[in-house]
């Protein structure tokens, strides 16, 4: 799951720039 914020979170394994 990617964060809509575009930052890396502990909940999200996917990081989008």
From Swiss-Prot:
GO annotations of cellular component type: extracellular region
Keyword presence, Secreted: yes
Principal location listed in the UniProt entry: secreted
Annotated signal peptide: none
Keyword entries, A-Z: Disulfide bond, Secreted, Toxin
GO molecular function: toxin activity
Subcellular location(s) of the protein: Secreted
Tissue specificity annotation: Expressed by the venom duct.
Annotated disulfide bonds: 2-14, 3-12, 8-15
Family, similarity comment: Belongs to the conotoxin M superfamily.
Domain notes: The cysteine framework is III (CC-C-C-CC).
Name of the protein described by the UniProt record: Conotoxin ar3c
């Amino acid at each position: 799951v990617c964060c809509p914020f575009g930052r890396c979170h502990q909940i999200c394994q996917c990081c989008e720039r």
